[in-house]
Amino acid sequence: MVKIGVLGLQGAVREHVKSVEASGAEAVVVKRIEQLEEIDGLILPGGESTTMRRLIDKYDFMEPLRTFAKSGKPMFGTCAGMILLAKTLIGYDEAHIGAMDITVERNAFGRQKDSFEAALSIKGVGEDFVGVFIRAPYVVNVADDVEVLSTHGDRMVAVRQGPFLAASFHPELTDDHRVTAYFVEMVKEAKMKKVV
């Protein structure tokens, strides 16, 4: 069984754990740097990206997270997690982890009061997935090797680049675990490649 970490500094940690377990993988709440060595994949949950960055810096997680990304182990960022994975952020000079060659705009759908749900078609996942958007970012631009998995209107809301997956919405806030299951499969495939 693959072991998937959920960065436990802030955000919808419990909900991600539940979704990972429902998808047939072991879930670990990651609160210490050394735990990164014990997991096969990592979820960066939604939350408030500025607060999350402060906590990542406070607990010296940034370089270990970048090292984890460079190791090729899969990472999945939802909402604020997408912001952490992006190489370019509109209106900001520097990236956070910067593992994905995507440009992201924060709070692109508006503030909290403008939160909404939308039925999405997601490549590799299926139709009618209810995306919960809360002060959501979206992807403005992608490199050629980034696969766009889903759009809402003309905005890219789910993308994949090799071992990295990012979504504007919160898949963990529904009882539909298909997006998490997709990530679990990515982790299984990556682990199998390492064994071979």
Swiss-Prot record:
Catalyzed reactions: aldehydo-D-ribose 5-phosphate + D-glyceraldehyde 3-phosphate + L-glutamine = pyridoxal 5'-phosphate + L-glutamate + phosphate + 3 H2O + H(+); L-glutamine + H2O = L-glutamate + NH4(+)
Residues noted as binding L-glutamine in the record, renumbered to the chain: G47, E48, S49, R106, I134, R135
InterPro entries per the UniProt record, alphabetical: Class_I_gatase-like (IPR029062), PdxT/SNO (IPR002161), PdxT/SNO_CS (IPR021196)
Keywords: Glutamine amidotransferase, Hydrolase, Lyase, Pyridoxal phosphate
Pathway stated in the Swiss-Prot or TrEMBL entry: Cofactor biosynthesis; pyridoxal 5'-phosphate biosynthesis
Family: Belongs to the glutaminase PdxT/SNO family.
HAMAP family noted in UniProt: PdxT (MF_01615)
NCBIfam families, A to Z: PLP_synth_Pdx2 (TIGR03800)
Protein's UniProt name: Pyridoxal 5'-phosphate synthase subunit PdxT
Organism of provenance: Bacillus cereus (strain ZK / E33L)
